[in-house]
């Protein structure tokens, strides 16, 4: 992603081609059927929130079919209060859920990802400014209080 962004900023077409080649190699390893692994050895899973910028900046690194399959693969993993960051724990980051929702073109997938974040905000027992890092099963605050990263909640407006 970073290589493609710098290539665009500098107008370096060879660097753009290199970024697209790297993305193509990645797709060869992981496929475009969704459910990409947490690590390249195929273990676990994770939200691919940083891929948001491929969609927002129209870099064209990965096909729309990849994003549709990947975001749909998250739906069965959503807990009461949101999608965990990855398969290692039940905590999440609300801003990154919104980044992930922005990658989905399907409004139903977006809504399914966003609704639990709103539910957490309404039902949390934590009496602090909106924490971006919380447990998706209990709403328990993990850390981080009232941080500016919550601007990521507006990712759907990009």
What are these regions (language model features)?
Residues 4-17:
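Inter-helical turn/loop segments and adjacent helix faces that build the functional surface
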Residues 14-50, 57-158:
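Non-catalytic carbohydrate-binding regions of carbohydrate-active enzymes
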Residues 1:
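A structural signal for conserved, well-ordered secondary-structure elements
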């Amino acid at each position: 992603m970073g290589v493609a962004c710098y290539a665009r900023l500098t107008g370096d077409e060879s660097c753009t081609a290199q970024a697209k080649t790297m993305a193509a190699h990645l797709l060869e390893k992981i496929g475009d059927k969704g459910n990409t692994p947490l690590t390249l050895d195929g273990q676990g899973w994770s939200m691919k929130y940083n891929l948001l910028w491929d969609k927002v900046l129209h870099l064209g690194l990965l096909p729309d079919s990849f994003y549709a399959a990947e975001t749909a693969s998250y739906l069965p993993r959503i807990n009461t209060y949101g999608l965990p960051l990855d398969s290692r724990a039940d905590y999440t980051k609300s801003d990154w859920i919104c980044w992930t929702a922005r990658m989905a073109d399907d409004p139903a997938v977006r809504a399914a990802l966003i609704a639990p974040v709103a539910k957490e905000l309404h039902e949390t027992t934590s009496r602090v400014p909106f924490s971006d890092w919380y447990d998706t099963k209990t709403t328990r605050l993990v850390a981080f209080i009232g941080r500016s990263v919550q601007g990521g909640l507006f990712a759907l407006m990009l």
